[in-house]
Amino acid sequence: MPRLHDHFWSCSCAHSARRRGPPRASAAGLAAKVGEMINVSVSGPSLLAAHGAPDADPAPRGRSAAMSGPEPGSPYPNTWHHRLLQRSLVLFSVGVVLALVLNLLQIQRNVTLFPEEVIATIFSSAWWVPPCCGTAAAVVGLLYPCIDSHLGEPHKFKREWASVMRCIAVFVGINHASAKLDFANNVQLSLTLAALSLGLWWTFDRSRSGLGLGITIAFLATLITQFLVYNGVYQYTSPDFLYIRSWLPCIFFSGGVTVGNIGRQLAMGVPEKPHSD
């Protein structure tokens, strides 16, 4: 019996010792973990302050950036205005060159009336005519893409400079035909040039906006030209006055379509102007 009692006593002591051992170890580990958490919580703000807390709160940064808008030093608006200025200068130059070339073709037929010393030079036009034509070309060339984007009417053909150059060649050819060819009467001349001008529009444009703007440009430009003639600012030779009125609207129509195609080609690949809400 004593031996059995000793056996039970030793087993119970060992069991109690084993039960008391792990709680002490777990308590020590828990205390160590709590100490580490306290150290991290104390040193965390200082680390965030040292690194500037880049990812602490990204939402306020996004809101502040959205409210502030584009930065003043952003090159995008300047690039847009720079490209607009480039397009305007190119269209102005095209208008000046076309005015000089077409006026030279008409002088060969003695349609325009200038002093002999002016006609003897290649710049055989009144000084204000080429700048006015250049300004009109810049306005028309910038207006065509704006109307297209406003109406949402895409162009029916693939834009390429080869097509634009062919359009310019046809336009110059129409002017050359009006200066060189002889017709039986002015009605025949008007119908022929009208057919050629509509053919130019159908071949290189085919847009309703192009047709409407071409007709509007032809009407307004013819009206302004006749106003200048009646007030003595610009003169035509008397025998050809009816001849001038017969071909002038067709020339202005085809010129508007041609300059519009140039403006559309220049506007390709240009990003839209940024809007701020």
Curated annotation (Swiss-Prot):
Q: What is known of its domains?
A: The KxHxx motif mediates association with the coatomer complex. Binds oxysterols in a pocket within their transmembrane domains and interacts with SCAP via transmembrane domains 3 and 4.
The positions annotated as site (Required for the recognition of 25-hydroxycholesterol) read F171
GO cellular component terms, alphabetically, are:
endoplasmic reticulum; endoplasmic reticulum membrane; SREBP-SCAP-Insig complex
Q: Which organism is it from?
A: Homo sapiens
Q: Which residues lie on this side of the membrane: Cytoplasmic?
A: 1-84, 145-159, 205-209, 264-277
Membrane topology of this protein: Multi-pass membrane protein
**Protein known as:** Insulin-induced gene 1 protein
Pfam families (UniProt xref): INSIG (PF07281)
* Induction profile: By insulin. Expressed at high levels when nuclear SREBP levels are high as a result of sterol deprivation.
The source's superkingdom equals Eukaryota
Record-listed cross-link Glycyl lysine isopeptide (Lys-Gly) (interchain with G-Cter in ubiquitin), residues: K156, K158
Q: What intrachain disulfides are recorded?
A: none
Motif KxHxx: residue span?
A: 271-277
